[in-house]
Amino acid sequence: MDRIYQGEEALCIHNAATGRELKFPNIISKSKIKKKIVVVGAGPGGLEAARIAAERGHEVIVFEAAPDPGGQIRLCAKSARRKDMMGIIDWRMQQCIKKNVKFNFNIIAEAQDVINENPDTIIIATGGMPNLELFETKKDLDNVFTSWDIISGDVKLAENILIYDEAGDHTAMQSAEIAIEKGSSVEFMTPDRLISSEIMGMNLTPYLKNLQNKKITYSIAKRLIDVSIKGNKLNAVIGSDYDENFNHSSTYEQIFLNYGVKPLDELYFNLVSFSKNEGEVNYTKFINGETQNIIKNKNNKFNLYRIGDAVSSRNIHAAIYDALRLVINL
């Protein structure tokens, strides 16, 4: 509902067809030809692809590296504020089970694993991993953590920390809440002109209300340029997009990045040469939910696609919407 206060249409994170019913009906039609579909990844995008494919009447097999479905949603649901997000996964799992989707958990699928299933279509929905490469340095920082580390509880938090938020999404705010609850003093820094630019008002307000009078300071229009070790602390070089002469340093005990994710796309590229379409998508047809028809090598046996964060760092709705547009006429 946040979107309507910014002059946008009302959409649903859970159901990408909501608000788009004229183009994408909620009732999925059956396919005239039954196909075998392999989906790699059981996050929101992968499960939506599996659900719709099964509704279409296809045989569907899902590979998932983790022991449970959910992907990044399972991580975000660790925060009490967002625990209900698991409903996105639970409902899709229920629907997939009803339609006899086969799940293979605890398997890091290799190219040969999916090829051996003799599929007609392979959909890569493997998501991504936190990005540690600052644009300015062109290298991964090996002396920092990510916001995922705070939410998962994998890192013991120090007293004085920096959360650098380039993505502007819920993850950084969740991290700040958790860090403060555990006793840390937080500087929340963003290169943007306002904090959490991807969180709209109705959702941002509860975060800000909870963080009032807590040990947090907000630093806007400041960009993290580089990080180096200085004694037993970290030295952050800080600049600004608004003043090329602005440059100073600050020290912290720990630095956490919220910098989006890098696609886990190795499997996709390993499969490209074996596919009919060489992984290519007709984006005009994709946007309109029309059947893909690109054939680059007719001697190969399957078509290959990728969705969600396996393409580029985005959000839950984007992954689900990708799945809907790709599979609704598959």
Model-derived segments and spans:
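Cysteine-cluster motifs in flexible loop/terminal segments that predominantly coordinate metals
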Residues: 1-33
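Acidic/polar residues at beta-strand termini and the immediately following turn/coil
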Residues: 15, 228, 237-241
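Short acidic/His/Gly/Ser-rich catalytic and metal-binding motifs that mark active-site loops
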Residues: 20-23, 69-73, 132-133
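Surface beta-strand/loop "capping" patches
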Residues: 25-37, 161, 224-236
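Rossmann-like dinucleotide-binding cores of NAD(P)H-dependent redox enzymes
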Residues: 59-99, 169-170, 176-224, 311
